[in-house]
């Protein structure tokens, strides 16, 4: 999910 906001 971190990749989505980064």
Curated annotation (Swiss-Prot):
Superkingdom in the source lineage: Eukaryota
Annotated tissue distribution: Nacreous layer of shell.
Stated name of the protein: Uncharacterized protein IMPP1
Species whose genome carries this gene: Nautilus macromphalus
